[in-house]
Structures are given as C-alpha cells and as structure tokens.
Amino acid sequence: MTEITQLFQYNTLGALMAGLYEGTMTIGELLKHGDLGIGTLDSVDGELIVLDGKAYQAKGDKTIVELTDDIKVPYAAVVPHQAEVVFKQKFTASDKELEDRIESYFDGQNLFRSIKITGEFPKMHVRMIPRAKSGTRFVEVSQNQPEYTEENVKGTIVGIWTPEMFHGVSVAGYHLHFISEDFTFGGHVLDFIIDNGTVEIGAIDQLNQSFPVQDRKFLFADLDIEALKKDIDVAE
C-alpha cells in the first residue's frame, strides 16, 4: 500500500494577514506532523524554519535560535518530506530560473509540493518579520521588515509550493525559508542565485488543515477575504 504524505498546516496565512499573531500551538506538537516546513512565531517574531525535524527561529537582529518544544506558533506548515524527484543543479541560476526548472518536473499544477534545496549560493536575500502586536495588519508590519543579503553562503532552502486554488489558505506558488549550513543566517527567501546544489521535490497527497479552535479572537474575527488575498500578494 502506498504511504500517504500529508501536509499539516496550522491556521491559515489569511488569518495571519489579518493580525492574528498569538501563538497557540507548541513546537513540540507541530513537529509530530512533519520534519520540513515554514511558519512564524508568537507575535510574528521572525521566521520559523523546520529542517530535518528541528525548528529554528530567524530573528530580526539576524540571529538564529534553535527552538524548544514549549515555544508557540500562530501559523506554520510542515510535512514529512519524501523526495519524489531529485536533481543536481550544476550551473548558475537565479531563483526564477530554478523555480521554472522545478515546476517542469511537476505532474500537474493542482497539488502541493514540498521543496528542499541544498547548495552554494553566491547571493541569498532574506527578510525577517519584526515582532508586532496582534491586530496590526501583516502588510503594515512587513513595511518595516529588516532585510539581509549574504554572499557565497552554503545552506538549505525549505518550503512549500501551493496551487493557485489554495491562495489565501497559503500563498500561491513558492513559500521558501533559508538557513545556512552553520546555522548563523536565515529567513524568508526574497531572491537568490545558486551556483550548484541538490534539489528535492516531494509529492503531497493530502492537506490536514488545523485551526486554533480555543482562540476566541480567531473564532470571532471578521475577515475581509478579498483584502487579505491582496495583502498576501504584497507581503509574501
């Protein structure tokens, strides 16, 4: 019997865009559902990177912290990554060029994919969302986000590719985070150049969408869905 690969997503990106930032799921609980993924932390304090079953926080001051099981997240997506396609990237490419190559391996455009790219990057441009109070729209917070660029850095990109039909639940297309080989640099990927590396594409069969059912703010939030989708386009 074929093993089912399930993407576990806690909360939605749309809810995050609306300013619902309170962490309500622990890292310990989250990691039961997958070993690769992305997200953010309580009060959107930086970027969450899940690699090889461990969780890291890329903070706005450019530091990286390995997270303990008790730390809480308001939004995250993780998957037990199983590479269906693996290929070597042996020539210099921009992020858009590599993404086009990755998509050429997709069997259709309506399934989620897990992405893992390990390699050498002449340029890596990332951002970290700064800590903010709940209620402030994410797009407003992102206008003051710190951005950093490192040159000639080795490391790993992890993330999820989302079909267009799920835009709002997540961000359509690529949502990628990076962490360096020495765990000193990382964040939400804005753009990059890769010289060489290994690219893994994982098939995802199911989406397990979980909600913060004990969070009263989430339960009664009045969300403008069309406005939230526009905010995702701007912020992500």
From Swiss-Prot:
Catalytic activity: (2S)-2-acetolactate + H(+) = (R)-acetoin + CO2
GO biological process: acetoin biosynthetic process
Lyase as UniProt keyword: yes
Highest taxon of the lineage: Bacteria
GO molecular function: acetolactate decarboxylase activity
This protein's UniProt keywords: Acetoin biosynthesis, Decarboxylase, Lyase
Enzyme class: lyase
Function: Converts acetolactate into acetoin.
NCBIfam families in the record: acetolac_decarb (TIGR01252)
Protein family membership: Belongs to the alpha-acetolactate decarboxylase family.
Name listed for the protein in its UniProt record: Alpha-acetolactate decarboxylase
Native organism taxonomy: Bacteria, Bacillati, Bacillota, Bacilli, Lactobacillales
